[in-house]
Swiss-Prot record:
Name of this chain's protein: Non-toxic venom protein
Keywords associated with the record: Disulfide bond, Secreted
SUPFAM superfamilies membership: Scorpion toxin-like
GO CC terms: extracellular region
InterPro entries for this protein: LCN-type_CS_alpha_beta_dom, Scorpion_toxin-like_sf
Tissue expr: Expressed by the venom gland.
Organism: Rhopalurus junceus
Similarity comment text for this entry: Belongs to the long (4 C-C) scorpion toxin superfamily. Sodium channel inhibitor family.
Role summary: Does not cause symptoms of intoxication, paralysis or death in insects (A.domestica).
Domain LCN-type CS-alpha/beta: residue ranges: 1-34
Domain notes: Has the structural arrangement of an alpha-helix connected to antiparallel beta-sheets by disulfide bonds (CS-alpha/beta).
GO molecular function annotation: ion channel inhibitor activity
Length: 34
């Protein structure tokens, strides 16, 4: 996962674009507090 966004904002953004490298983190952060 190195080289890919792992912070909440980055994951939210990549999630919008369905980034497979951050999808898990995106979903994880989306279900948690903003």
């Amino acid at each position: 996962k190195e080289g890919y966004p792992t912070n909440s904002e980055g994951c939210k953004i990549t999630x919008l674009f369905n980034d497979p490298y951050c999808k898990g983190x995106c979903i994880n952060l989306s279900t948690q507090a903003d």
